[in-house]
A protein has these predicted regions:
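Extended, intrinsically disordered, low-complexity segments
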Residues: 2-4, 232-283
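Alpha/beta enzyme core
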Residues: 2-14, 20-230, 236-244, 277-278
C-alpha cells in the first residue's frame, strides 16, 4: 500500500499529465473497491452519495465535517489509490473554519479536497467574492504546511445555483488561483465555448463534472493538460457500469441497448456504462459534484 505522500505525489502527477484524467466518486468502501478494480486511477468522495446512504439530501448543510471526513478516511485506507474528498463549503462560513477542515483532512489519508463557494443557504447561495477568496487562501495556507502535497480544488458553484454568469465564474477562478488553489471546478458548466474560456483564463487544471449536465462531456479546444474529468455524485452510478469490463482484460460482459445506454443483462439497476471515450482518452474535457 502506498503511503499518503506517495498517493499525493501520484495525484499531482495525474493532474499534470499530457492526457486528461478520469476520476470517479464513491460513497463507501464497497464502491471504492469496485472503481479500483476497473482501473480508475483517482477516486473522489461525494457528499451526494454519502448523504444518500443516510437517506438525507445533499447541499442543504446537513453533511457534517465529522461524517464526511470519517467517510473519506475509511475509503482512503481501503484502496491503494489517491483519494480526494468532497469537503462541501469547508463546513462553515469563516476562513478559520475552512482552515481547520483542511488541517483535519490532512490526518485522514486523503490527498486532496474541494471547497465550494456555495453557502448551502438557498436564499443566499453564493459567498461574496472577497470572502470566497479569503476562504480559499486560508485553506491553501494550511494545505501548504501539510507533510505532503495536498491537492486543493476551488469550486465556483454559480451554475449549480442558477446564477449562470460566466464573467463572474472567470473572476472567481482567477481569484482562487491567486489565493493558492491547485485546481478549479465549475459544476454545471457544460458549454464547450464557456469551458474553454475558463481553461484559457487560468493556468490551473480545470475540472468538468460529469453528471451535473450532459452525460457526454463536450470537446474543449484547450490544452489537454489543463482538462480533467470527474464522474461524481449521482452520476457516479454510471461509472459502476465499468464493472462489466475491466480495461486490459479479455473478459467482456454481454450488453444490450436500453434507451441508448449499454446495460448488463440481469442488472436490475440498469447502470449505464461510461462512453468509450472515457477509456480511450478521446475527449479533452475538464472535471467532482
Amino acid at each position: 500500500m502506498r503511503s499518503t505522500k506517495e498517493k499525493a505525489e501520484l495525484c499531482r502527477a495525474l493532474h499534470a499529465g499530457a492526457e486528461p484524467t478520469l476520476s470517479a466518486a464513491c460513497w463507501d468502501v464497497g464502491t471504492a473497491y469496485l472503481l479500483a478494480h476497473v482501473g480508475v486511477p483517482l477516486i473522489d468522495t461525494t457528499s451526494f452519495g454519502a448523504m444518500a446512504t443516510r437517506g438525507l439530501p445533499d447541499a442543504v448543510g446537513l453533511a457534517t465535517r465529522e461524517f464526511m471526513l470519517g467517510n473519506a478516511s475509511e475509503i482512503a485506507a481501503a484502496v491503494d489509490l489517491p483519494v480526494q474528498a468532497d469537503l462541501e463549503n469547508g463546513f462553515g462560513d469563516s476562513p478559520e473554519i475552512v482552515a481547520q477542515t483542511i488541517l483535519e483532512a490532512g490526518t485522514t489519508g486523503i490527498v486532496g479536497g474541494s471547497i465550494e463557494d456555495a453557502t448551502g443557504r438557498p436564499a443566499d447561495p453564493i459567498y461574496p467574492l472577497e470572502l470566497a477568496e479569503e476562504r480559499i487562501r486560508a485553506a491553501a495556507e494550511v494545505a501548504r504546511a501539510l507533510p505532503f502535497p495536498f491537492m486543493l480544488t476551488a469550486r465556483a458553484d454559480q451554475y449549480l445555483w442558477g446564477r449562470p454568469d460566466l464573467a463572474e465564474v472567470i473572476r472567481r477562478a482567477q481569484a482562487f488561483e491567486t489565493a493558492g488553489a491547485n485546481a478549479i471546478m465549475v459544476p454545471g458548466l457544460n458549454d464547450p465555448v464557456a469551458l474553454k474560456s475558463v481553461c484559457d483564463a487560468v493556468s490551473l487544471p480545470v475540472v468538468v463534472l460529469i453528471g451535473a449536465g450532459p452525460t457526454n462531456p463536450p470537446e474543449i479546444g484547450c490544452d489537454r493538460r489543463k482538462a480533467h474529468r470527474r464522474w461524481r455524485g449521482h452520476g457516479s452510478r454510471g461509472a459502476l457500469g465499468l464493472c462489466g469490463h475491466r480495461p486490459g482484460s479479455n473478459r467482456r460482459a454481454r450488453t444490450r441497448r436500453l434507451a441508448g445506454r449499454h446495460v448488463r443483462p440481469r442488472d436490475h439497476r440498469h447502470l449505464p456504462e461510461p462512453p468509450r471515450q472515457f477509456l480511450t482518452g478521446k475527449l479533452a474535457t475538464g472535471r467532482q459534484y
